[in-house]
Regions:
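Juxta-kinase regulatory segment immediately upstream of eukaryotic protein kinase catalytic domains
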Residues: 1-10
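ATP-binding pocket architecture of kinase catalytic cores
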Residues: 13-189, 193, 197-201
Length: 202
């Protein structure tokens, strides 16, 4: 879009029930380029600077992973447009990606407690959502991470191999989220089960 003209941006909006890990802003834009008119929906995500949902934001890594998956695999992800780390623009690093319209489970309140998935969706719709989510998860875990140069995701401070690192990260996240209170019993039970059934391979 370096030669774009007549750029117009719609009023900004944001999701109210999901997308809290980063500041999320939705907008539409139209422009002209090489004599042609274009219009597209976009998502702007800004790195959190105060309230954070996760122990580590890994903001740069999010963009790098999504870009690689979109460019080099068949995993369905939004088209990543550009990344800007100059904090003088919006006060924090941000990236812009294409928007994929649809209905997603909400976080506030959790979709298991209220909202369209619990109150309106048919059992077949819930099954489709769960199975498509599992398919996407399996597709991500089936990629050749070495050919995609995903070595930057290594977190040796949490352990020797990836599985161990991820498990220790989850444990650290519980302690970080509320140092004065242990993890919920269901989470403790899940962590214990995972520890006892960890795969015996690197």
């Amino acid at each position: 879009m370096t030669t774009a003209t007549d750029i117009e941006v719609s009023p900004l909006s944001g999701p109210t029930a999901t997308g809290f890990s980063n500041e999320t802003i939705l907008f539409d834009a139209s422009w002209k380029e090489n004599g042609k008119s274009y219009s597209e929906g976009f998502v702007l995500r800004v790195k959190p600077t105060q309230h954070t949902v996760f122990l580590e934001s890994d903001f740069d890594a999010q963009y790098a992973v999504l870009s690689a998956l979109g460019e080099k695999t068949n995993v369905l992800v939004p088209v990543m447009k550009f990344f800007e780390d100059d904090t003088s623009v919006l006060g924090a690093p941000f990236f812009v990606m294409g928007r994929i319209d649809g209905k997603v489970p909400q976080d506030n309140p959790p979709y298991t407690q209220g909202g369209w998935l619990l109150e309106e969706a048919k059992p077949t719709d819930r099954r489709t959502l769960v199975e498509s989510g599992l398919d996407a998860l399996a597709a991500v875990h089936s990629v050749d991470w070495e050919s995609l140069n995903f070595g930057f995701l290594d977190k040796p401070q949490y352990g020797r191999i990836g599985f161990e690192q991820q498990l220790r990260y989850y444990e650290a996240s519980f302690a970080w989220a509320d140092p004065k209170r242990p993890a919920p019993p269901v989470a403790e039970s899940a962590l214990k089960w995972i520890q006892e059934h960890a795969p015996e391979r690197d």
